[in-house]
Amino acid sequence: MRVADFSFELPESLIAHYPQPERSGCRLLQLDGPSGELKHGVFTDLLDNLEAGDLLVFNNTRVIPARMFGRKVSGGKIEVLVERVLDDHRVLAHVRASKAPKPGTDLLLGDDESIAATMVARHDTLFELRFNDERDVFTILNAVGHMPLPPYIDRPDEDADRELYQTVYSEKPGAVAAPTAGLHFDEPLLAALREKGIEMAFVTLHVGAGTFQPVRVETIEEHVMHAEYAEVPQEVVDAVLACKARGKRVVAVGTTSVRSLESAANASKEALIAPFFDDTSIFIFPGYHYQVVDALVTNFHLPESTLIMLVSAFAGYKNTMHAYQQAVAEQYRFFSYGDAMFISRNPQAEQESVGA
């Protein structure tokens, strides 16, 4: 399968740099997986698409202000993007500098260079940093960090992004990118969904910077997926099994919820799904057999990305690429701050061939 098969033309003008004034005020492109039929609407149409007893599964990770600027004590500017918090004082981070720091290098971080840190070790492409500070990592980042907006949002982060680039139900800090499908849910919509009898459950997947890394191989099967930490607790397992037992749909809010649920299903030895607390590097592309997810709420993804491959595996390759072409023609807004899709699973997708 060629990565190039998942390319599409996207005008720069359709990349959203700010969200809509109202979270639920975005547009919604509905794709019926089995038929390929498209329907244009607004996000609150989700209420009409869901039935009492359906289960919405959200990712409750919280984005941390993971980007810091500073310099080496010895000189030279540096940019740090925290990928994973190891403990109260240590992190794994991506580091950009004219010359990579060696172990033992002292750093001054923050716009006012008030945070002292030391590079203690290197792990492949990541650097282990220790903060020489009484405060814990999260307190430091909240004080001096910048929100890590995606590379395609070509502007500096603003104070408003601390709220806007965060779901209203975010709870567990650790992500360096938002689970963006969830950004469209506001409290009135969540209340209306509950009133209709829609069940809700929460997984955690701390989205890493790897989610923005391009696929650098020509054939999909050669791609090595980055690892992210995920939690699917027992209450989510119980909710999924109860939903299936009553003949209703498990609806994943975002590709991170999909990857969490399907990771838990793949790791389960006997039942459909079992609790999961581990790193996952699951890579879902056409041919994958979905075990848990029946419908999906998701944003529009980058050309040739692993996420458009995941959607193609869910809705069918031809359905997905046609939907994206129509979204461009109808001037939907793309990527993290853009519009959304509601997709029902196409059971024939895994048999479909990919390409022209």
UniProtKB/Swiss-Prot annotation:
Reaction(s) catalysed by this chain's protein: 7-aminomethyl-7-carbaguanosine(34) in tRNA + S-adenosyl-L-methionine = epoxyqueuosine(34) in tRNA + adenine + L-methionine + 2 H(+)
A matching Pfam family: Queuosine_synth
E.C. number: 2.4.99.17
Pathway: tRNA modification; tRNA-queuosine biosynthesis
Keywords: Cytoplasm, Queuosine biosynthesis, S-adenosyl-L-methionine, Transferase
GO biological process, one term: tRNA wobble guanine modification
Gene Ontology cellular component terms for the protein in this record: cytoplasm
Compartments it resides in: Cytoplasm
Main location: cytoplasm
Domain of life: Bacteria
InterPro entries xrefs: QueA, QueA_dom1, QueA_dom2, QueA_sf
Molecular function GO labels: S-adenosylmethionine:tRNA ribosyltransferase-isomerase activity
Coiled-coil residue windows: none
Record's subunit section: Monomer.
HAMAP family registered for this protein in UniProt: QueA
Entry's family note: Belongs to the QueA family.
Role, per record: Transfers and isomerizes the ribose moiety from AdoMet to the 7-aminomethyl group of 7-deazaguanine (preQ1-tRNA) to give epoxyqueuosine (oQ-tRNA).
Entry protein name: S-adenosylmethionine:tRNA ribosyltransferase-isomerase
Organism: Serratia proteamaculans (strain 568)
Gene that this sequence comes from: queA
